[in-house]
Amino acid sequence: MIHYVCKYTPLELFKGFGEECAVLEEMPENFELSDQIAHANLCGFGKSVIQAVLEGKVEQLVLVNCCDSMRRVYDIVESTGKCKFLYMLDMPHEDNDCEKVKLAQGIHRLKKAYEKFSGKTFDRSGFLNAFSHEPVDNQPYIGVLGVRVSGILEKMIRDNIRMDVENLTCTGGRRLAVIREELEKMEDDAMFLAYADALLSQMPCFRMNNSTRRNRLYLDPNLKGIIYHTIKFCDYYGFEYASIKRDIKVPLLKIETDFTSQSAGFCGDPGRL
């Protein structure tokens, strides 16, 4: 099992190695282990990743250098030697043609690194078979935005909301616009470039330099309310929350956690929406 933390991670690539991927969303009871080797002001999610590694729950991990916290997490996890396979993917903060080429090259390097680690040969058909199209449901919903939410917190929100809930955080809104039949006709270099294009063409993370397309999230007529999640010591999404609070026309509830299971129980009542 390969764990990942970001929707820009090339999950389909690992299907070409016959590997399953799972988002790392551990929400530990506390940071007893990670606090021993990480700075006190590291964000709670970063600590949760370190905690999961130290508890032996993660053997293969792919990180993305989306922020300083993730870079520190990589350094710390690497120093522990607890992961059999640990990789940091260099993620562009733009979606122009040059950055797409850069990401495609990064995917190539990741492919080679995993071939060397696993001793497996990349299966192109397995990669292509990983792409699927999910139907879009045009029903009224409550959107969960901001920092990623754990399975525990997402379940708590769903249990307290009498309406469909859409996870629109950085791990929940992963949709790739890919036509498999077109990929099949391409040589490898062109195929991975098209793959990089699809990854970067997703609804942008707020960490992207041009995140204006995120406005479509707030302007969706089916959006009937927003639960906005922030994490202690993470400033990125606080700026977006301030903007939404000023301009949004639907009910808005902000919740903050430190990414422990204890804090999830005290982050606010979603039923208030």
PLM regions: where:
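An N-terminal assembly and electron-transfer interface module characteristic of large anaerobic redox
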Residues: 1-273
